[in-house]
């Protein structure tokens, strides 16, 4: 199951990178934005499914800290 999780994470990364290409309008792809969003959702679902099968859970405290750091980065850019 760990190999499956790694594979699904890789597919999610690829889907996210394709969406980034669409947003930046660089390195054209025949995939539409709607298709890219659907693909991200599908791959994310696969990652969550694998994580569930492995009984992985979210660390809420870590998520809160990360949320604060990301928010600070956004505020600092503006």
Q: Which residues does each predicted region cover?
A:
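Flexible "arm" and connector segments at domain edges
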Residues: 1-78
């Amino acid at each position: 199951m760990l190999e499956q999780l790694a594979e699904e994470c890789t597919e999610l990364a690829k889907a996210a990178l394709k969406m980034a290409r669409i947003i930046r309008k660089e390195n054209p792809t025949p995939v539409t934005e709607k298709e890219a969003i659907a693909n991200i959702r599908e791959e994310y679902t696969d990652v969550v499914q694998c994580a569930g099968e492995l009984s992985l859970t979210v660390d809420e405290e870590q998520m809160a800290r990360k949320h604060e750091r990301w928010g600070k980065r956004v505020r600092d850019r503006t």
